[in-house]
Each structure stands twice: as structure tokens, then as C-alpha cells.
């Protein structure tokens, strides 16, 4: 199956010539006794930064950036999916010219050159009887870590037991999951503009390199669902410098419980 979509958004002045072209290709083929799904996607876009990036006025921040150029983006990616194996692999490359971002002063700025971003994500699920292990690994590489910082590696693993009890009326799920990403100089948050921006060079905070572990239990009985979770169960067991965003620490250990009951009309 092949698809192509072209959108022209140009109107007047600098908006003339805006466009976005999408292309998709879907293929299914046999591999031994399994069906493999292959997807190829790509797009080319040439668009002005958002109105918010070009014009903003408030008590603390003001800007009018009428001279901003269009962002030119090109991306190509491929995806391979084998459902029977629980395997999904996706990889892509993107080139961005005139990348628009919020600088160290939380003001919009454009990078006049080209930035390339390579990325690959592998999802692999394993099952042995009632035991399940879901995994997701993402690798990223940016050609300009100063303007577009990214964690090079992000991990998610979820190990759980899934079983049906009481004559298969009660579904029970017990497990633990962990999230982790490598250290990098993540964007800081500016409440005044409600946006993430590059960290000031004199106040860099490197975040990452710290796992967040949760344990949980889910019960499903007819129309009733009950869940319980201990979030960040490993709080206080490792580095005290644990942040999701610079200067915003991760929430401490937290217990959550909830009930969902569906009523019929």
C-alpha cells in the first residue's frame, strides 16, 4: 500500500511556499511461518515557526521575530514488525535546517545550520507461561548536542506475572517496571513562558543515569478493576541527585491505589 499526501499552507509574505509532503509504504511478506510487516515513512516540510515563537508579549517576556526563516525538515524511517516474535524495530534519520528553539535566556532563536538526528527503537516482548518481560530500548544521536541535547540511550523494562484465577473470572497482574536514560544536559523549564529552554552555561545540571523503579498489582473481576502501585520504590537507595528536569527532583516514594467500577445503563 502506497500513500502520498501534499499540503500547501502558504498564504502571503513569508508564509508563501510553506508545504509538507508525506509518503508511506506498507508491505507484508512471509518469513518462514510468520508474517512480517514492513513500513517505510518519510516527509519533507518547509514551514514557518509557530506564531508563538515569532510573537509573544507578557509582563516578563516580549518578542517579535518577523525575520525568522522557515524550518526545513526531512525525515526517513523504516519499521519492521513481527507479531509472533513480539518484535518491533524502528529506525530513522532526520535533517533539520533553521531549527527553532528557546535559548539559555528562554527566548526563541534559530540555528542557521543543519542538524541531523539518528534514532532507533527496539521493542521486544518475551513470554513464558504466566511470566512476561516487555522491553523497549531507544538509541538517539544528535549532531549538535548544544542546541538539541538528547539522551543517547533510554530503557524501559516491565516484568510481570499475568494469570487468571477463580475459574478464570479473576485476572491478576503482579509486576515491576524500570525506566532509565543516560546522562545529558536536558532542557530547563521556564514557568514565565511555560516552555523548555537550553540551560544557562554557568548553571548546567546533568540529569539521568538514575533508574526509576515501580512495583504494582492489578486485579480485574467482572466489572471491577483494582490497582495498587508503589512509585519510585528505590527512592533514597542511590544518588540523591535524581531529577527528571533540571532543578525539579523526582517525586519521592509514593503509594497509589484506585478502583474502577463500570456501571451498565
Model regions: which residues?
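Exposed, low-structure sequence patches enriched in small/polar residues
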Residues: 1-265
Amino acid at each position: 500500500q502506497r500513500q502520498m499526501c501534499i499540503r500547501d499552507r502558504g498564504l502571503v509574505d513569508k508564509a508563501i511556499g510553506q508545504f509538507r509532503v508525506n509518503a508511506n509504504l506498507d508491505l507484508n511478506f512471509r518469513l518462514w511461518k510468520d508474517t512480517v510487516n514492513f513500513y517505510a515513512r518519510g516527509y519533507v516540510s518547509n514551514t514557518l515557526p509557530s506564531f508563538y515563537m515569532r510573537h509573544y508579549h507578557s509582563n516578563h517576556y516580549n518578542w517579535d521575530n518577523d525575520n525568522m526563516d522557515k524550518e526545513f525538515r526531512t525525515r526517513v524511517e523504516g519499521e519492521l514488525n513481527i507479531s509472533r516474535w513480539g518484535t518491533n524495530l524502528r529506525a530513522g534519520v532526520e535533517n533539520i535546517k533553521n531549527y527553532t528553539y528557546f535559548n539559555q535566556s528562554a527566548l526563541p532563536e534559530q540555528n542557521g545550520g543543519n542538524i541531523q538526528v539518528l534514532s532507533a527503537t527496539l521493542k521486544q516482548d518475551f513470554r513464558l507461561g504466566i511470566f512476561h518481560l516487555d522491553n523497549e530500548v531507544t538509541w538517539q544521536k544528535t549532531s549538535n548536542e548544544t542546541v538539541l541535547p538528547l539522551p543517547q540511550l533510554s530503557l524501559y523494562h516491565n516484568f510481570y506475572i499475568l494469570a487468571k484465577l477463580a475459574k478464570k473470572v479473576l485476572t491478576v497482574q503482579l509486576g515491576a517496571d524500570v525506566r532509565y536514560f543516560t546522562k545529558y544536559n536536558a532542557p530547563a523549564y521556564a514557568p514565565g513562558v511555560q516552555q523548555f529552554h537550553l540551560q544557562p552555561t554557568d548553571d548546567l545540571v546533568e540529569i539521568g543515569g538514575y533508574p526509576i523503579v515501580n512495583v504494582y498489582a492489578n486485579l480485574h473481576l467482572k466489572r471491577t478493576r483494582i490497582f495498587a502501585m508503589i512509585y519510585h520504590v528505590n527512592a533514597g537507595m542511590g544518588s540523591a541527585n535524581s531529577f527528571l528536569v533540571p532543578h525539579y527532583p523526582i517525586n519521592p516514594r509514593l503509594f497509589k491505589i484506585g478502583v474502577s467500577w463500570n456501571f451498565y445503563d
